[in-house]
Each structure stands twice: as C-alpha cells, then as structure tokens.
C-alpha cells in the first residue's frame, strides 16, 4: 500500500509574506505626492519664519502647488474636456486664486490638505482592496502532486480537475477539491470566518488557502485555479467595488449642477461687490473661500467608502455581496422568505425508507441513475445512498423544477417526482407517500415508462442555528420570517414549528414561490429571499434582494442571487443584514456631517469673516472625517458574530 505522503523533493521557495506594517502605504502614488507636498510646505513655512528671501519662500510654496496639485488639476482638465465639472478643479482654481492676491501660504495649505485628503481616500480604497486581495496570498504557489505512486512538486496554477494532491499536516491547501483519503481538521476561518476547525473526511470538500490540521489528506482537485472559492471571492468583491450605490448615483447626478452653481455663485460674489467699488483683494479672498467651503467633496465621499468597507468585511466572514446596490437593498429588508431544503435544513437529507412496488425492480438504482446529474439536495442524497453499487448510465436528463427529474436509463424513461407531480391513481403510492409525510419526511415517486415502481422516503434535519437565526431575523425586520417550499405540508409544518416559523406556504412550484413574493411586494414591502436550489431562482429574481446558500447552492441560484454565503450557517443572514443597516447609518451620518460642515462654513463666509486657512481646514477636515468614518466598517467589530443579538 502506498504511503499517504512519501518523501518528496522540497518545494521551491514560497512567495515572501506580505509585510504586516504600514509599509504598503508608500506603494500608493497619491501618498507619496502628498508627503512630498507636505515636506515642501513645511520647508517653505520654516523659510518664511526664518526670514528667508521672498523668492525662496514663493519657490518652495509654488513647488508645493505643482507636486500636490498636478494630478487633481489634470483630472479636472480631462473632466472639463468631457464637459463635466470636477470638484478637484474647483480646489485648484481656488488655490491659484489665493496665490494671485498674495495668499500663497493659504493656497499651499489648501493644496497640502487637499492632497492629504485625496491620499486618505486612496488609502481607504486600497485598504479595502487589500483586505480582500490578501486572500489570494493565502493560497500556496506550489502543490504536491500524486501520480503513479510518486510525488512531485508542481505550480498550483498548473493543477487541473482530476489531479490528486497530498496535503501534509500544517500545510495550506493549494486547490479546491474533495478528500479521497485521510482525515483531519481544517482551519477555514480565512474563507468562511468560522472560528473552529472543520472536521474533514473522505467525501468532504476543502478550499484553497485553508490550513490543514494534524492529519494528512489526499485531495482530488475539482476546480480550475481561477475558479477556486478564494479566487471567486476576490473577483466578486472586485466587481462589487466597481459598482455604484443608488445613493451615490443620485449624488453624482446632482453634483454637476451643484458644482456649476458654486462656480456661478463664486463669480457673483466676485463681480457684484466690485461693481459697487469693493476692494479687489478682500472680495477675491471671500469668493475663493466660498468656492472652497461650498465644494461637495465630503458629500461625494459619504456613500461609497462605508458600503465598500462593509462589502469587504462581509467577504472576510464568508458572505459575498455582489454590488453596492445589493448592500443598500439588504438594509431595506422588511420580510425574509426562507426556502426549506438546504436553507432552513442542513441540505443533507438521507434515505429513510425505500418501498418497492414491483418485484425485482431496482428502485434505488433507477432513481440514482436518473438523479446523477441533479443539483437538488434530495437528488444528491439518492445518489449518495446508491454509492458502492453499479448505477447505469443515464441520458436525455431533464430537470423538472418543482416536480423532479426525468432521464433515459437502459432504454426506459425513468422519472423521480414529488407526490404532487404524480398524476396516477395508484392507491399504494398515495398510501406510502402519506405514511412518509406523516413521519415528517419527504417522499418521491419513482416511475418507469410512466408506471410507479417504488417510493423513496427522505428525511432532513434542521440546521442547529436555524431557530436562533429565525428569532434574529424577526427582531431585525419586526416581521416574522416566512417559509416557502415545494415540500409537503406535513413535513414543512413540522420543520417550521421546530424553527419557530408560523407562516408556512407548502407544495409550491417555482412560479408559485415567485407569485407569493410578488404578492408580498405589492404594498411596497421589501422582500429578501434566501434559497439554494434551482427552483428558488424565480422567487429570487422577483424579490427586492436575495441570498444564495452558496456552499451547496445550485449554479443558477448563485448567479441569480445578489448575495452568496460561503459560510454554511443560516446565522450569517441576520449578520449581513445587520451589517448593511450599520453601513446605511454610517452613510446617513456622513451625509449629515458633510452637509452641516458645508452649511456652517458657507454661512460663516457669507455673513461673517471666515479666514481662508480656517475654511480650508474645516472643509478638508470634514472630508477626512467622512472618509475615516466609512473605514470603521472594515473592523471585525462591525460584523455581528452568529449567535449574537443584532441591532
């Protein structure tokens, strides 16, 4: 017998660990430019205080202008070419205006604070990206490939589905796959956020980037390197970061008109007093101050940093929010609709009984052959129960959403359907189905060429965290969750009672689920649908927003859903809703903070004497505070651990 992991040549040097210090900050270009501008400003200030010649002082301050202002100026000019008015350009014009009246110090201060504010924005964005992209560094670059009784070290990027790799104790797993040998416990916290290691045995799935425990494993690769869970997490969050929230789109829509209004008001503040003989210097100074403090920099930053930080935080805990719009919509949730199998239950049903109606019929074998391409948990349970026996090949496979499956097996049309989809009058079939359902199980009828040959009973178990999750959802939404299922009324009612759900709608086809969701939403109720099967996709598409239980979820469901959970816990649903609501509160707080700062500074400038340096500090300071406030949602404290009470 071949050892699980015989001696093997040492792996090439691994990639260097990413530094944990703040050294990465210097990789952000805007940080370097802001630091250089600050250095020039401080040097100019020192020269001014020491009585250096004016030419030297001006040279240093103007150099600060160039270093700190060239990039926003270029961005503003390009925007102007596209007939849009960028806030950055207003800041540069104000700084130049200050220099023209001899206030080069104030203009340089504006440039430094503005450059620092922009650098902090970029740091916020980069930190959000790094918090997600850092997951890619968890996956090792090399793997130990097993083949023909020997082992060799290969690049993890060269692994393909079907390859078998060896994972030693303490090593990181280099690919997504299924355990085919050995047993261990795996630390999956980097992917799913689960705090405790998960036991892994033959048949269990493992993910790239997770850490093997004390046992050795043989793993059959099941996904291409670009399609691993960790790679898809990064891809999804990157795509989400490129989207814009509804609030942000509205802000950007009015920003152009508002900015144009600021320019018009600035020109009016400059020209009207001059027409009545006002002093040029003081009038220009007031107008420039107005342009600075009225600019909507903080308002523009109020929305996206909190939402993107929340998306990054959720991804670290095994929940992928596909867009900023989805994060906003999660916060709107009024009612949560749950599927049963694979959502409220563990999605791992087992065969409880097999009844043969025709002597000699291989009921389980026929059903397993027809179900071998099915993604439904009941189908997978039937296939798993037939493991170890010879199952014939099936062709012409057709999924019948909400009803069952059909396939051609050994020249016969075999169907595995729900009792509701069985149109026959066989009394024995009805009797056996009723007995299974009375016990709280789920029955399926096996047909061969239209004739019933057997009945299979399956039983599923409630997720351990389901009752607590249902209670949390009711507390969050102020409305008890609803259960929509295609299963029989007895089984659905029994399970719903265990979970604490009173509103149960059973024996629904996919279009029936969608119709129920649409009915709920007619009175402007925002419905969140949580499901995992193909038959949940229509209801998800009809809902305000949707979550797919992605670990066992069907591909169509995962594609349709706005949110995908990798962590196999129903408690992540109230947790991500609570995070979305916290993000919304931060957005509102940011908008109030930004609006209050702009209003206060504008009124002070119009009806008082607002010094330019104070206006600059107040305006840019509020912008920085808004950006930093959004970054708070990157903290693990912002995520409510499953089991905690959401607010």
Curated annotation (Swiss-Prot):
It comes from the Bacteria. One of its GO terms (molecular function) is ATP binding. It is an enzyme of class 7 (translocase). PROSITE patterns: ATPASE_E1_E2. It is found in: Cell membrane. Its main location: membrane. InterPro entries: ATPase_P-typ_cyto_dom_N (IPR023299), ATPase_P-typ_P_site (IPR018303), ATPase_P-typ_TM_dom_sf (IPR023298), ATPase_P-typ_transduc_dom_A_sf (IPR008250), Cation_Transport_ATPase (IPR051949), HAD-like_sf (IPR036412), HAD_sf (IPR023214), P-typ_ATPase_IB (IPR027256). Keywords: ATP-binding, Cell membrane, Cobalt, Magnesium, Membrane, Metal-binding, Nickel, Nucleotide-binding, Phosphoprotein, Translocase, Transmembrane, Transmembrane helix. It holds the Pfam family E1-E2_ATPase. NCBIfam families: ATPase-IB_hvy, ATPase_P-type. Belongs to the cation transport ATPase (P-type) (TC 3.A.3) family. Type IB subfamily. This is Probable cobalt/nickel-exporting P-type ATPase. The gene is ctpD.
